[in-house]
Amino acid sequence: MTGSWEARYAAEFFGTLILVLLGNGAVANAFLKNTTGNDDPGLANGGWLLVASGYGLGVMLPAMMFGSISGNHLNPAITIGQAVIGIFPWAHVAPYLIWQFLGAIAGQCLILALYWPHYRQTTDNEAVLGTFATSDHANSQLNGFVTEMVGTAVLIFGAMGLYRGMFFHQNIDIANIGVGLLIAAMVISLGGPTGPALNPARDLGPRLVHALFPVPNKGSSHWEYSWVPVVAPIVGAVIGIWIYKIFFGL
């Protein structure tokens, strides 16, 4: 990583903003009424592939833009996981997390503004919430926790392999593409139960926007579930990075 810590904080802010804008923006295009991606809420022309592509590109493009500056965490679980393992300084964990959450909030505010007419036309309040935050479709916090934990563990393990592998370590742009594809694959394969979040900032920041702003046709923000996509990804990240260290070293 290069540049001052202030530049790294800015990179985390704008990177997370872009992640949420492209990822949650794809969800909005897929599930809000009368968008170009969907004529009926919940019946997207692009389907889940549209959403997966949004999140995959939402991680890949900021990685290409800001990876050399901040490491392109964009995710409190990654930051905390790296700190636990000793490859990121604890002194800068809190600032990274703050700017990641602020970036997620800013990205969601842009989505709300840009899709405002479509929020007004969408009467399904669960579809509306889905463009902000996640929930467990089986109404099970345990199922949600396990899904988010396992998904994030696989994500971090895979990302470590891509960025630290012998070939990809010398071809960082290809590694960035690989991480984008990994995110898209995770959304396709593990998106059924919860969404998924895999990222505390991507869920909690937009959930705050849903709760605090006068979103048309909104229902509950489901705060009883909100701890799951915050705690589970952090636990999963620590597990994933420890497994990688045990078998392959750092």
Curated annotation (Swiss-Prot):
GO terms for molecular function: glycerol channel activity. Keywords: Cell membrane, Membrane, Transmembrane, Transmembrane helix, Transport. PROSITE patterns: MIP. The chain crosses the membrane at residues 12-32, 46-66, 85-105, 142-162, 172-192, 230-250. It is a multi-pass membrane protein. Probable transporter that facilitates the transmembrane diffusion of an unknown substrate. Is not permeable to water, dihydroxyacetone, glycerol, urea, H(2)O(2) and D/L-lactic acid. This is Glycerol uptake facilitator protein-like 5. It comes from Lactiplantibacillus plantarum (strain ATCC BAA-793 / NCIMB 8826 / WCFS1) (Lactobacillus plantarum).
